[in-house]
UniProtKB/Swiss-Prot annotation:
GO cellular component: cytosol; nucleoplasm
Family annotation (SUPFAM superfamilies): Inorganic pyrophosphatase
Reaction(s) the record says it catalyses: diphosphate + H2O = 2 phosphate + H(+)
Gene label: PPA5
Pfam families: Pyrophosphatase
Localization, UniProt: Cytoplasm
UniProt-annotated catalytic positions: 88 (proton donor)
Protein name (database record): Soluble inorganic pyrophosphatase 5
């Protein structure tokens, strides 16, 4: 010990008022009063909806990780890693304060130059609709562009995109679940009109859901 004297540690005095253990129910009730926001329910859809609207990004462009919203906590969670070698061709997320028949917010594929971190939100414009059937259930996707991206903000119709871009999008959704033995069918892309109608319908469904919740 290099000649140093080893001191014997003195016994610590017991605290007169020990810290109580946190009760999980109390902690949960406190969290409901916190400033943390739920991206589905607390984020506004935007004054320009259903044409221009906010989108919460769940999955970044180029990612092989399938993130999704955890509806209970509002956090973005890892659902799975894609079973195939494909990656998401564009940023993918949902429109806040919308609701579809599958009890999820409406899905959006946002075309823009750069990948966006999961959990961020951006402004987008609907330019088309991709009708899709996932394992026998309707699962349509809104095709949109980021209105704050100078390369894409002028696009208002899906027909303005290169045909190859649309082929890439279609092929991704046709193939990304094949190795899971899950069947996905993608129909022909539709114009902005049906996309805007689908968003408005999902906004109306969400409003009905909120009213029903408040009445209970």
């Amino acid at each position: 010990m290099n000649g140093e004297e080893v001191k014997t540690s003195q016994p610590q005095k017991k605290l007169q008022n020990p810290t109580p253990r946190l009760n999980e129910r109390i902690l949960s009730s406190l969290s409901k009063r916190s400033v943390a926001a739920h991206p589905w329910h607390d984020l506004e859809i935007g004054p320009g909806a259903p044409v221009i609207f906010n989108v919460v990004i769940e999955i970044s462009k180029g990612s092989k990780v399938k993130y999704e919203l955890d509806k209970k906590t509002g956090l973005i969670k890892v659902d799975r890693i894609l079973y195939s070698s494909v990656v998401y061709p564009h940023n993918y997320g949902f429109v806040p304060r919308t609701l579809c028949e599958d009890n999820d917010p409406i899905d959006v594929l946002v075309i823009m130059q750069e990948p966006v971190l999961p959990g961020c939100f951006l402004r987008a414009r609907a330019i088309g609709l991709m009708p899709m059937i996932d394992q026998g259930e309707k699962d349509d996707k809104i095709i949109a562009v980021c209105v704050d991206d100078p390369e894409y903000k002028h696009i208002t119709n899906i027909n303005e995109l290169p045909p190859h871009r649309l082929s890439e999008i279609r092929r991704f959704f046709e193939d990304y679940k094949k190795n899971e033995n899950k069947e996905v069918a993608v129909n022909d892309f539709l114009q902005p009109g049906p996309a805007i109608e689908a968003i408005q319908y999902s906004m109306d469904l969400y409003a009905e859901y909120i009213l029903h919740t408040l009445r209970r």
